[in-house]
Amino acid sequence: MKTVNFTEMKAGTKDEYLLLDKYEQDYINGTADRILNFMQSLTSTLEGYKITRLEHSLQTATRAYRDKADEEMVVAALLHDIGDELAPLNHSEYAAAVIKPYVSEKTHWIIEKHGEFQMYYYAHHLGKNKNQRDKYKDLSLIHISEPTRPY
């Protein structure tokens, strides 16, 4: 593999940055495979549940599919908890950031906010506001635009 000669970014030449851009495009093209490989790590997270996070993710995607959601939403459902491993305190935002370049603004918003919506089922047991999601009740998702995809 060819490498650049510079050790400081300001010393890079056009040809070197063109080379790096090509490598970056190749790397970007492998993103889906890396994400699917990473999904395996969800088999060992969050003890105490009856199923693993991977099983939960597969169940969520299956439910979306059976509900006749579009392909984008099925994939988003599959990936909605990928942040649990590396960003447990903001897993929703992490997952949303990963999928943002590839999905509509609406789908991005749903993944980004799903952590707040799930609080409805448990937050009151922990002395927190279970109605956190209510702040969005007047929000209209109808006007959210479709994505300009990078691919």
Ranges and model annotations:
Residues 122-141:
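Amphipathic alpha-helical blocks and their helix-capping loop/short-beta junctions
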Residues 1-87:
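Acidic/His-rich, divalent-metal-binding segments that scaffold phosphate/diphosphate chemistry
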Residues 57, 61, 92-121:
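Histidine- and acidic-residue-rich, metal-dependent catalytic cores
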Residues 80, 114, 143:
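Histidine-centered divalent metal-coordination motifs
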Residues 84-88, 119-123:
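Secretory-pathway/luminal and periplasmic proteins that interact with or process carbohydrate-rich
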Residues 142-151:
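Single conserved hydrophobic/aromatic residue that forms the stacking wall/gate
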